């Protein structure tokens, strides 16, 4: 299992990544970490009873360029439970690139149920092993609208650095 540390303006979060169950997703995430993609990005979507999403925007809400989308691995048996990390995507099940989210409660409706557009779900590829208190603090920040986006923290929550620990 790979481990990644996110140093954020709200504190430190450590993610344990499940290479065995989500190999393509983990390799994709690690490629973004290695390239420095996440450094200086924000948690741009925060919904207190759902999830916190980041990895795609700068503090001034400029979207970062990404690599090609990856195949959805949501059929790996991992569940969108509290403190798990999963890939964000559009309505296309196979559109995930760099953005990810941390579930802040059990979100069973995001789990894979079938290989159909509505059943694919969202690929879980890891979990928070340290910094659950930081995740809880982030989910409680005040949010508003910014540049056409909803649920954006009024005070940016910045991922100052992301690094591979092991």
Curated annotation (Swiss-Prot):
GO terms for molecular function: endonuclease activity; magnesium ion binding; peptidyl-prolyl cis-trans isomerase activity. Transmembrane segments: none annotated. Optimum pH is 8-8.5. It is an enzyme of class 5 (isomerase). GO terms for biological process: DNA catabolic process; protein folding. Belongs to the cyclophilin-type PPIase family. This is Peptidyl-prolyl cis-trans isomerase cyp18. It comes from Streptomyces antibioticus.
